[in-house]
Amino acid sequence: MSLLAAAIPSTSSHFSAPFLPSFRMPRKSLTAPLHRIRRPRPFTVVSSVPDPAAGPVEYTPWLIAGLGNPGNKYYGTRHNVGFEMVDRIAAEEGITMNTIQSKSLLGIGSIGEVPVLVVKPQSYMNYSGEAIGPLAAYYQVPLRHILLIYDDTSLPNGVLRLQKKGGHGRHNGLQNVIEHLDGRREFPRLSIGIGSPPGKMDPRAFLLQKFSSEERVQIDTALEQGVDAVRTLVLKGFSGSTERFNLVQKYKFHRV
């Protein structure tokens, strides 16, 4: 039984596990033992409708995963801004990331009354799918509620973009996640602009480089804005506010 199912009161029949597309996962991912630092807090499912006769309310969990590399030497580098965003989200929502499962460091909590799983894969960037695929299956998270957060060299430093779906854009971590979701690409993503390598600089060296002081200010501002964007997405879904957010982000550094 999943933690989500365990959290559903036995007196209610209104909640059911969400539909989950089939994922291709290595057998070893399913049978690997779980090593917990502390006992995780189960998903909490709470109805916002005070009168049960008013109708059933379903709260489908979200899996919010930031992509990056584990280890202190990667902390603060361009390629790890996905990790930083997840850390900010967890801190703002009071979620403690204290569980190791499926090659991930994760925390279980909620945004508003919506259950969320915040995740930092520990399998290294290029193998992020080995962590996210099994977690999505174990917690029965539908594809439309898997939010990936990652760095994007096609966007100026500190510019964010929120999308319902898309390709991998030659991002190795994102590509590996798609492969472990059976080639499916219809999941949300929040990309964080880190700029592009100057001149003939090696792209790998650029990704593993830390931000300049000016760039760091822009990234910190973007992380704050990203937390608000994720909260709005989880509570309200994609809407006109998403389009306005992307438009504001696109021109945030333009001078008129």
From Swiss-Prot:
Chief location: plastid
State whether keyword Transmembrane helix applies. no
Q: What is one Gene Ontology biological process annotated in the Swiss-Prot or TrEMBL record?
A: RNA splicing
Q: Check the record and name the Gene3D superfamilies matching this protein.
A: Peptidyl-tRNA hydrolase
Tell me which residues are marked as the site Stabilizes the basic form of H active site to accept a proton.
151
Q: Where in the cell is it found?
A: Plastid, Chloroplast stroma
Q: What does this protein do?
A: Required for the splicing of group IIB introns in chloroplasts. Forms complexes with either CAF1 or CAF2 which, in turn, interact with RNA and confer intron specificity of the splicing particles. Has no peptidyl-tRNA hydrolase activity.
Designated name of the protein: Chloroplastic group IIB intron splicing facilitator CRS2, chloroplastic
Organism this protein belongs to: Zea mays (Maize)
Q: What gene is this protein a product of?
A: CRS2
